Each structure stands twice: as C-alpha cells, then as structure tokens.
Amino acid sequence: MFLIILMFFLQSYGHSVSQNVSRPNIVMVMSDAFDGRLSFDPGSKVVQLPYINYLRELGSTFLNAYTNSPICCPSRAAMWSGRFVHLTESWNNYKCLDANATTWMDELERNGYNTKMMGKMDYTSGSHSVSNRVEAWTRDVQFLLRQEGRPVSQLVGNMSTKRIMKEDWKNTDKATKWIHQMAARSQQPFALYLGLNLPHPYKTQSLGPTAGGSTFRTSPYWLTKVSSELVSIPKWLPMAAMHPVDYYSTFTKNCSGDFSEEEVRRIRVFYYAMCAEADAMLGQIISALRETGLLNNTVVMFTADHGELAMEHRQFYKMSMFEGSSHVPLLIMGPRLMSGLQVNQIVSLVDLYPTLLEIAGISAIGNLSGHSLLPLISKSSNISKKQHPNWVLSEYHGSNANASTYMFRIGQWKYIAYADGLSVPPQLFDLTLDKDELHNVILRFPEVQAHLDKLLRSIVDYPKVSTNVHLYNKKAFSAWRCSLGGNYSQVIANLRWHVDWQKDALAHEKAVDKWLSGSLETFYDYNKC
C-alpha cells in the first residue's frame, strides 16, 4: 500500500506547478507525544505510517532529534523561541513564554510571509489545570501521592470509524481549506503551522473534569495499521532498583501497581494506532499541497513536542529523559533539500527557529540557542556549511519528577544530572550498547561522568538554575495558597491527588508547611500571606 501511495506522490511531486523556490512556502505539522523512534527502522515497522514514510523517502530524517524539555508547554516554548528552557524560564506547563514573545512565525510574517497558526499552540504562560501547576510547585514536598489516573486503553467505534480525535480533524480540515485559499491567491509565500493533540492520551473522563490524560483510545480501523506481533513488552527494573527520580515518576503516574503483560501490550498497541491516525492528518495536508500544485514549492516539516513512554520503564506519559519520552520525530522535505537522507547528527527543537529563518532567506537573530539544520540537508552549494554542535541539552522542571533534570546527549552517551549535582545521584547510559537504558554505568566510567558534567556546566549553571526553580516554586505556590484564603484546605485536598491526599490530609498540609518553612531565602516567610 505504501509503495502505491509513494509512486502516486512521486509523480505529483515532480509535476507540481512551477514556482519560484527562492522563498518557498513552509508547512509545519507538530504532533503531541509522538515517539521519534517510529519515524525510522526498526520502529517504523511496528505501525503503518505511509505519510511519514513518504517524507522519509523524499526528504531528510533526523535519527537523533530531541525535545529541549519533555513536556508540552516548555518544549513548545523552546521550539517557538529558539532558546533553551532555562533562558526563557519556562519551568512547567503553567510558566512558559510571555504572550508577546517573538517567535519564528513573527519573523516570517515581518519579512513578507502570509502566516497562519492552527490547532494546539501551548507555548505561553497561564494554561493547563490547577492540579498540574500545583503538582509542579510541590514536587519537593516530602510526600508521595498518585497524581494521574492509571493508564488504560479504550476501543471505540467500528471499522468505519476513522475520526477519533475530532478536534484535530477539525483543525486539519481548516488547514486544508486554508491551503486551497492560498493557492487561489497571489504568489506571496505562506507559512502554516498545524498543531495536533494526537497521539497524546485522552483525559480519563470517569476520573472527573480535572483528570489528566491516561486513556489510550482508538478504533478497530486504526488497530489494523499496527503489527501487533512486532509490539515488544518493555523490560522493567524492580521498583527497589530504580533511580529515586524514576521511582517518584512511576509512583506519581500511578504505575506502581501490578500490570499484566496483556495490559501493557494493549496500551502500546493502542498508542501506535493513535500514531497512525495522526499520520493520516499529515497525509491530508500533503494531499492538499499536491492537489493545489504547491507541493513542489513547499518545505514540509513533521515533528513533535516530546515522545511517549507507553509503559517503557514502568511509566506512561513523558516528563522523563528516557528515549521514549525525549526522542522526537523530525522529518523535512522540500525544494533544494536532500531526498532519502538519514541524518545521524544529534539535534533538538531549538534548531528549528534558525532553520526556518534560513529557509526563508532571513538573517537569524544573535541570541538563539539553536543552529540551522540547513547545512546538513541542503543540496545548494551556497549554504554555509557551519558545523552543528555535537551535543544537545534537554531539561525538565515540572510535575511527576521530584528534581530538576538535565540531559546532555553527546556521541554514544546520555548523561543525566539532577538538582545541584550532589543531592541526587546522576545517571549515565551508553546508548550504543544499552538502547533500553536499563544499565546506569555512572560508577564504571567516572572519567566520562566528570568530562560530561564539565561540558554540561559550560552550557548551563544547572545548580543555580535548580535553585531558581526551587524558589519560584515556593513563591508561586505561596501566592496561590494566599489567593484561596479559607478555601485552601478544601481546594488542595480535591486536586487530582485527592484519593491519596485525603488518607491523611492534616499530615500532607503539615508537609507543605514544613517545605515552605525551609526557605533558601531566610528573609522571606512563605507561610505568611
């Protein structure tokens, strides 16, 4: 089936309307929680993704692309601003960019592009649930509470049911219509961004309006796209052998209980089916470009804000530096770009800002964290062949992890430092020998750890950043608590952690008070309003 689709599009791609390619159109489709390892072999064999495969055949696939923060808003803040999370202070899903922050889309519009943004944006401050922000603020409190619903799978509809995520399909239809409108207008280049919610798990409705997303939902139609026999059951470390931050994540994500092998397999199969539905939305956008004769003069990019663990490491969701969570897809196709290229260079989402500006012929501003990827994928000899850094930085400061986390990826190594670098032990994985990341070799390679930690500190003073996040959490929580007045005890007891909180509400409130009293700023009393 894929070969038929590819031949059809190859013919169309070669016979699109001839247009000036000096300033090509730009289309970015950004999904949510898409495991980047599915965009190339062997992961791509598990589920049929014909349109991602199409981009792989006619464009460039980045085999080592990473999020700069494995959670929605901070990751998108990095992508839209081109700057690392600690520079924009995008600490959690509630604290990200200011509403007036300059994005690469602003730069394109300022330089003559007709721009449109549709679907999930999620890069500015102020969004997400109260539970989500309070869980992030209180991650240093000495209690352990389940914050998410237990991950489950849900089958809906029948073999004719193709549109499960209706909001995404609605936005995809709008984007398709907009492309047709652009084709009928002037030759002014355009830039289109389409943000998808899929394959992010759905809210578990039975847990109430504040519930997080723990339901993997699909239909029989999309299940046929998954080769179930190729779906692996991930190995888990015993809970007692887990790193303390991973233990905290597993518990707060409600994954510490028993799971049958069939449960785990079903969650993973359903997740892959959700990826297939997202791929179909990408396909509709590509089809619209082909039908309008615009495909030959359009750079098409597919990526995601982060991945999905799908029960690897006894976790679902993201908020982790393990590959399932931090590795994102990145495929780029367009005029004067290489075809069928697989790029081993380690890259990250902050690289997209300078890449898109260079594609549009716009000089990049000087304070970006990222570097253009165009030298790696362009056919043109006029493109500067500046060497891309051989490392990436990802960091995490939000909920479901009880320490600020810093991932430094270089060569075969993934080094993960925490907090101040001393209070929480670091981790080191050799991804060449240990693709499942089950063997922390930090004690075997002290020289490697020392070298990588020195490199990491040359990029970010992570102990200082961790202190800043710690102080922000206390100030933000204290302000929120004061805003509630006499309703505080009732409100905090009924957040997503209510089942565990209400087992001993008084003890949990005292733990919060103790945390606030242990201030790093002795002149500030966080317990007073």
Where on the chain are the PLM-derived regions?
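Short, solvent-exposed turn/loop segments enriched in Gly/Ser/Thr/Pro and often Arg
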Residues: 41-43, 59-81, 96-97, 117-128, ...
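Short, structured active-site-proximal loop/turn typified by the sulfatase FGly-forming signature C/S-X-P-X-R
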Residues: 39-75, 82-83, 109-116, 229-233, ...
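C-terminal cap/loop subdomain of S1 sulfatases and analogous C-terminal strand-loop tails that border
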Residues: 172, 306-312, 350-353, 358-431, ...
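Classical eukaryotic N-terminal signal peptides for Sec-dependent ER targeting/secretion
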Residues: 1-7
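Catalytic-site neighborhoods of secreted/periplasmic enzymes
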Residues: 78-174, 178-184, 205, 211-217
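N-terminal signal peptide
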Residues: 7-20
